[in-house]
UniProtKB/Swiss-Prot annotation:
HAMAP family to which the protein is assigned, alphabetical: DnaA_bact
Protein name, entry field: Chromosomal replication initiator protein DnaA
Cellular compartments per GO CC: cytoplasm; plasma membrane
DNA-binding keyword on record: yes
Location, primary (coarse class): cytoplasm
Gene name of this polypeptide: dnaA
Region entry Domain III, AAA+ region, spans: 116-332
Segments for region (Domain IV, binds dsDNA): 333-454
Domain of life from the UniProt record: Bacteria
Region (Domain II), start-end ranges: 77-115
């Protein structure tokens, strides 16, 4: 619970914002007589002098949200009470400021075990896209029938693409359905630390009690698992114990099981008993949807062209995408801007862009053409020549797309660089590949792999 001081600050800010945004008469009538009784959990309890003023206050959520973020740094909701409508219980509760005596809401059930779960990550706030569709479906299936459908579930993919998010979502869902479920989320590093501590302190029994009696083990980033013999052995035994009693195991990694050199084959082969599924980078639509959701909790206004601009800047990592949005928000706030325009966004992201441009500054059309030809095993002369079979025309379109995308070269100039083609041909190629980038995973992967070479 927040200290009184913070509550006062919060309320002062609410009234100040109100004074700035509404007329004096309305302020004196609706705002002035209101009192902040308490802030419990993330809810501000506000007492009005009359029930008829509730409707007006219901429309003032901006004041509360803004002040809440400024003072508490998080989303604050609010509950309205009116002097002329209060029951005795409510009045007592508000005056005592004691949520303990008369809890308004039933306490959330918690697992008897320290689960390590983060409630923030759930299925509802996970945006589905072509890059994560199957993995999301598998995760939902696992949460629905743990230990049944896909066991273990092995999720792999690059950094910041939602692997950890999905793990927590599975755990939270299972915990909601079954509040007594024994669940543990742990990074591989912490599993190793727990084990090392247990052996050092002679507490192996308690370690095994914890880990081998779980209903669900979520083990994150197994590529960081230590390759020490003892730990690996313990992991192997834990895995077997859990698997044998039908407990669900979910693992993540940045690579496929076969590439995990830190783990033994006998363990890696067990990973494939269940389902191995990957997450790839979000396409443009998914990035937009993620930005839309994340920007909703901001009290600034993000027009869609601004979000589109941000989505165009960061294309391979959701964590960075969130970081970019935060950065833009920060700069907008610092400049007192409430409707965030592209100009502000581009200013905020300039330093980010500089970093990527640095690595692209040596890039030339020729280099892109060479890499593409190389990637698809065709010759440079075919790539820019007149031949038109699919095996050549497709890489050519990819190369044109990349030149346009990465170098911003004009359409006619690209046409020239590709054997003197017309600019409409280039435009067509660009459109073809842009469309495919939205829903064709193979094309996304190709482009990703080629880009990584630069
Ligand atoms: P990973 O474990 O794959 O490195 P995380 O699960 O930590 O990635 O995701 C990084 C951030 O991006 C988190 O804040 C997560 O909530 C967010 N995120 C990733 N994918 C999505 C998605 N599809 N929808 C919403 N948020 C996402
Ligand atoms: Mg992670």
């Amino acid at each position: 619970m927040a200290s009184l001081n913070e509550n006062q600050k919060f309320w002062a800010r609410v009234t100040e914002l109100a004074r700035q945004s509404i007329g004096k008469q309305a302020y004196d009538f609706f705002i002035e007589p209101a009192q902040l009784m308490s802030v419990e959990q993330d809810t501000a309890n506000i007492l009005l002098d009359s029930g008829m003023k509730k409707d007006y206050w219901k429309k003032q959520s901006d004041l509360i949200t803004t002040a809440g973020f400024e003072v508490f740094g998080r989303m604050i909701d609010y509950e309205l009470y009116a002097n002329d409508e209060l029951t005795d219980i409510e009045l007592r509760r508000l005056n005592n400021q004691s949520p303990v005596d008369e809890p308004l809401s039933v306490a959330k059930p918690t697992s008897p075990l320290v689960s390590g779960l983060n409630e923030k990550y759930n299925f509802e706030n996970f945006v589905q896209g072509p890059g994560n569709r199957w993995t999301l479906a598998a995760a939902i299936a696992v949460a629905d029938k743990p230990g049944d459908t896909y066991n273990p579930l092995f999720i792999y993919g690059g950094a910041g693409l939602g692997k950890t998010h999905l793990m927590h979502a599975i755990g939270n869902q299972i915990l909601t359905d079954n509040p007594t479920a024994r669940i543990k989320y742990v990074s591989s590093e912490n599993f190793v630390n727990d084990y090392v501590n247990a052996t050092r302190k002679n507490q192996m029994e308690s370690f095994e009690n914890t880990y081998r009696n779980l209903d669900l083990l979520l083990l994150d980033d197994v590529q960081f698992f230590s390759d020490k013999e003892g730990t690996k052995n313990e992991f192997f035994n834990t895995f077997n114990a859990l698997y044998d009693k039908g407990s669900q195991i979910v693992l993540t990694s940045d690579r496929i099981p076969q590439e995990l050199n830190n783990l033994e084959d006998r363990l890696v082969s067990r990973f494939s008993w269940g389902l191995t599924t990957d997450i790839t980078a979000p396409d443009y639509e998914t990035r937009m949807a993620i930005l839309l959701i994340k920007s909703e909790s901001s009290h600034l206004e993000f027009p869609s062209e601004t979000l589109s601009y941000i989505a165009g800047q960061i294309d391979s990592n959701v964590r960075e995408l969130e970081g970019a949005l935060n950065r833009v928000e920060f700069v907008a706030r610092a400049n007192g801007i409430s409707i965030v325009d592209i100009e502000t966004a581009s200013q905020a992201l300039r330093s980010l862009k500089n970093a990527t441009q640095q690595s692209l500054s040596n890039l030339t059309i020729k280099k892109i053409q060479d890499e593409v030809a190389n990637y698809y095993h065709i010759s440079f002369s075919d790539l820019v020549g007149p031949k038109r079979p699919k095996e050549i025309a497709f890489p050519r379109q990819i190369a044109m797309y990349l030149v346009r995308e990465l170098l911003g070269t004009s359409l006619p100039a690209i046409g020239t660089a590709f054997g003197g083609r017309d600019h409409t041909t280039v435009m067509y190629a660009y459109k073809q590949i842009s469309d495919k980038m939205k829903n064709d995973m193979d094309v996304q992967k190709d482009i990703d792999s080629i880009k990584r070479k630069f």
